[in-house]
């Protein structure tokens, strides 16, 4: 499975840009393989992302904002979920990846 981070390269929101950078930077720094999917350039990917986000993670109005994280077809979460996993040191579990300890044994 591959980690996919759905981003918006042309977002006018500074908060969205910072959140995207935080996730991408963390993944790069920890050498976690991932793909960036730009939903502003790929309409079919944007629609796919919207369809795969669980109802409980959708806003009352509008569409879910990037960044959104998937492992293959499995929804991992949004920035808030990612941030929480960083705080609790459970990023590998959040991303549905084997932990570093598991891969060393």
Curated annotation (Swiss-Prot):
One of its GO terms (molecular function) is SH3 domain binding. Its main location: nucleus. Keywords: Nucleus, SH3-binding. GO terms for cellular component: cytoplasm; nucleus. It is found in: Nucleus. SUPFAM superfamilies: Thioredoxin-like (SSF52833). It comes from the Eukaryota. It holds the Pfam family SH3BGR. A motif (SH3-binding) lies at residues 61-67. Belongs to the SH3BGR family. This is SH3 domain-binding glutamic acid-rich-like protein 2. It comes from Danio rerio (Zebrafish). The gene is sh3bgrl2.
């Amino acid at each position: 499975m591959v980690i996919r981070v759905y981003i918006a390269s042309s977002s006018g929101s500074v908060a969205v840009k910072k959140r995207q950078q935080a996730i991408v930077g963390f993944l790069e720094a920890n050498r976690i393989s991932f793909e960036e999917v730009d939903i502003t350039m790929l309409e079919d990917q944007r629609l796919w992302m919207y369809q795969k986000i669980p109802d409980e993670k959708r806003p009352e109005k509008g569409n879910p904002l990037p960044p959104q994280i998937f492992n293959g077809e499995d929804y991992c979460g949004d920035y808030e979920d990612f941030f929480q996993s960083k705080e609790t040191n459970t990023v590998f579990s959040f991303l549905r990846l084997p932990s570093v300890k598991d891969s060393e044994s």
